[in-house]
Regions:
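A short, structured beta-strand/loop element
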Residues: 3-43
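Intrinsically disordered, low-complexity and often Lys/Arg-enriched segments
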Residues: 1-5, 75-76
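Long, charge-rich, low-complexity alpha-helical segments
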Residues: 28-76
Length: 76
């Protein structure tokens, strides 16, 4: 079955100022992507955040790709 980021990520106004978070948590997708970008391994992230699974990390990457692929530019 194809993984859908929508199954793992949500935005709620009352949680983390509406930033995308992993469902059922206050953990932002932004934070996890920053951790990956600074060189933290997936194994380290999963050990540090036991509520996450490898599928959550894949969902974060798919979410990021979806944003980049949008027709509207986010650059200022």
């Amino acid at each position: 079955m194809k993984l859908k980021w929508q199954d793992y990520i949500e935005e709620r106004k009352e949680v983390m100022m509406g930033k995308p978070v992993f469902k059922g948590t206050r953990l932002t997708v932004e934070h996890i992507l920053q951790e990956l970008g600074t060189g933290m391994s997936q194994e380290e992230i999963l050990a540090g955040y036991p509520q996450l699974t490898p599928e959550h990390l894949r969902a974060a990457m798919l979410f990021s790709a979806a944003l980049i692929g949008m027709d509207q530019s986010i650059y200022v």
